[in-house]
Swiss-Prot record:
It comes from Cereibacter sphaeroides (strain ATCC 17025 / ATH 2.4.3). Pfam families: RecR_C (PF21175), RecR_HhH (PF21176), RecR_ZnF (PF02132), Toprim_4 (PF13662). It comes from the Bacteria. The lineage of its organism: Bacteria, Pseudomonadati, Pseudomonadota, Alphaproteobacteria, Rhodobacterales. This is Recombination protein RecR. The gene is recR. The keyword Lipid biosynthesis does not apply.
Length: 199
């Protein structure tokens, strides 16, 4: 079986490092790019070079931006008293796609993890406490994933912020829209029952 030339094989190996792309998917993607060099590969390479040169973390919230502050932090129409804490930028983007939250964000950059030796100083938790103190935040919404590390991080943040008197809330957990009880795990059903509200 013929192998791809070395430089193309290197590109395939790099593509395979991306989440959701295994070796076969990466190979197919590279073949499509090679087939459509002018329409796909060249613009993609240019866009990647531009983003690599300009992308950085927002100085205030940790979102990805090409300026000192991201568009959300610069938006004067945002509610300045509400601060939504997320694990990473993908979570921020998911909340923005929903189009419901009109406050500001704080990206932690991960979660506390004893196994991975990730402590509060490796995350943006000290910066979060500063923002609550300095920006007049009235509510911190913890929008962290319902994993053991996510919930450990949420409890830690609540403890850190308790002396400030800020209201700390978390996202409701339970039955997803369109979900059927028979397909849900026991933990999700229990969380939904505990978070029930008047109909």
């Amino acid at each position: 079986m013929a192998e791809a030339p070395g430089d193309i094989e290197r590109l395939i190996e790099l593509m395979a490092r991306l989440p959701g792309l295994g070796p076969r998917s990466a190979r197919r993607a590279v073949l499509v790019m090679l087939k459509k060099r002018g329409a796909v590969m060249a613009p993609l390479a240019q866009a990647m070079a531009e983003v690599a040169a300009t992308a950085r973390d927002c100085a205030r919230c940790g979102n990805i931006t090409s300026a000192d502050l991201c568009d959300i932090c610069r938006d004067d129409r945002r509610a300045t008293g509400e601060l939504c804490v997320v694990e990473d930028v993908a979570d921020l983007w998911a909340l923005e796609r929903a189009g419901v939250f009109r406050g500001r964000y704080h990206v932690l950059g991960g979660v506390l993890s004893a196994l991975d030796s990730v402590g509060p100083d490796e995350l943006r938790i000290p910066r979060l406490a500063e923002r609550v103190r300095d920006e007049g935040i009235s509510e911190v919404i913890l929008a962290l994933n319902a994993t053991v590390d996510g919930q450990t991080t949420a409890h830690y943040i609540a403890d850190v912020l308790e002396p400030s008197g800020v209201q700390v809330t978390s996202l409701a957990q339970g039955v997803p829209i369109g979900g059927e009880l028979d397909y849900l795990d026991d933990g999700t059903i229990g969380a939904a029952l505990r978070a029930r509200r008047r109909f």
